UniProtKB/Swiss-Prot annotation:
Record GO terms (molecular function): catalytic activity
Gene3D superfamilies to which the protein is assigned, alphabetical: Endonuclease/exonuclease/phosphatase (3.60.10.10)
CC annotations in GO: membrane
Protein name stated in the entry: Uncharacterized protein YbhP
InterPro entries xrefs: Endo/exonu/phosph_ase_sf, Endo/exonuclease/phosphatase, GPI-anchor_lipid_remodeler
Biological process, per Gene Ontology: GPI anchor biosynthetic process
Pfam families in alphabetical order: Exo_endo_phos (PF03372)
Source organism, top-level taxon: Bacteria
Gene: ybhP
Amino acid sequence: MPDQTQQFSFKVLTINIHKGFTAFNRRFILPELRDAVRTVSADIVCLQEVMGAHEVHPLHVENWPDTSHYEFLADTMWSDFAYGRNAVYPEGHHGNAVLSRYPIEHYENRDVSVDGAEKRGVLYCRIVPPMTGKAIHVMCVHLGLREAHRQAQLAMLAEWVNELPDGEPVLVAGDFNDWRQKANHPLKVQAGLDEIFTRAHGRPARTFPVQFPLLRLDRIYVKNASASAPTALPLRTWRHLSDHAPLSAEIHL
């Protein structure tokens, strides 16, 4: 009998949206950013630095949405979304968000902050596409600015990945702030995660600063999955929308 098993693929996008403002907070561009994100037609979107709420900005920022920023971005294109609050301040809070065309059956936000005021988190979502009925484990990541903090956070991330069911696909994407390129080795050795740009091109993609990318800060890792068409999206479209270049890829299960 012929093999009835069919490969399932989906498109992922990750981007640090800088709370919906241009560099140095000169201009609010969330509506333009939503339009750009929609053109990618990603099935799963991992967002960092998403404004969850703010009491002051709506009073003086033109085009400030009535909903949370992640709901505004999801709009009618992504039926499911999840938000993990990381940084909290008197006026509001921001964190990571995941938008999905497929049902998010469970999500939780884990605090990976290490000493001091720098608040960081990993947003986990268990996503189950109806056409497969099988779980995809997605983690949206924003790690710290200090190397020692990042190493501790990478260890926490690896431990969490290892707690997931054996053989099930894992996607880890986001802003790793890993300008010294020290994340790939521990994540591969400790958790079996492969960075897809490194697998395809020998090293992670340059993503920061978006005007002239030099640093390789943003990543897409997979486990129990393969990837194709890893792409740092064209700067001419995105350079005024974020300080990071977005990354996208096709993931195959």
